[in-house]
Curated annotation (Swiss-Prot):
Its main location: nucleus. GO terms for biological process: epidermal cell differentiation; regulation of transcription by RNA polymerase II. This is Putative transcription factor Ovo-like 1. GO terms for molecular function: DNA-binding transcription factor activity, RNA polymerase II-specific; RNA polymerase II cis-regulatory region sequence-specific DNA binding; zinc ion binding. The gene is OVOL1. A zinc finger (C2H2-type) spans 118-140, 146-168, 174-197, 213-235. Signal peptide: none annotated. It is found in: Nucleus. GO terms for cellular component: nucleus. Putative transcription factor. Involved in hair formation and spermatogenesis. May function in the differentiation and/or maintenance of the urogenital system. It comes from the Eukaryota. Pfam families: zf-C2H2 (PF00096), zf-H2C2_2 (PF13465). InterPro entries: Ovo-like, Znf_C2H2_sf, Znf_C2H2_type.
Amino acid sequence: MPRAFLVKKPCVSTCKRNWSELPDEERGEIYVPVSLGFCPPQPYQEPEPSVAEPPSCPLALDMSLRNSSYSVTPGPCVVAQLPSEDMSRLAGPQSRDHGFLRTKMKVTLGDGPSGDLFTCHICQKAFTYQRMLNRHMKCHNDVKRHLCTYCGKGFNDTFDLKRHVRTHTGVRPYKCSLCDKAFTQRCSLESHLKKIHGVQQKYAYKERRAKLYVCEECGCTSESQEGHVLHLKEHHPDSPLLRKTSKKVAVALQNTVTSLLQGAHHV
């Protein structure tokens, strides 16, 4: 017999609660789907001449407005509280028909202000910045803008596409200095150093690390954009990335020269 139990409560409106603020001993293992508050179907009854009170449940009110030929007597609204281990039962098609709304949101916290959170209206995941929400919303798009030229798989972000293409080309730019292993991502290398060699990273938490410019043609790495451009010109002159990168370097160089000329003019 499942441990689920019913508690009679009035219908509550959809609310957003940041569960990360509660300690573990107060958070518990209870998960309450708010939209589960529905009224059980009642048998048909003849309308009484007296003025009927407005339904206390919004679902019963909506049903009465859709079909005005008969009235529905609202029953007590019931909210179910289910343990976390019973969540797998809610993943079926029956649960999706009710449109459950999670009140236990997953919050992605950053170093931003402690103001209002930006919440995804599809999966209720919350973010501290609007740009983080905009990036997250791409994963819900049905149309994939960036396609892999090897297998045709689509992605919504160029970073994800670049990471996927390395599985076809075999490019592993992040090499371990203590063994012969190499990895396609920096995080995989850092995890390898920590678990296998016991090397702790020197940078602080969420500190921006030095960018590594990777040649996707041969896997050569450069610490500066200028060195990356020189490598492309020397070894891959027909690379489509060379034209785009050269424009960026030219604009940066022009801005530097302009600032130097303006400084000399003021002197």
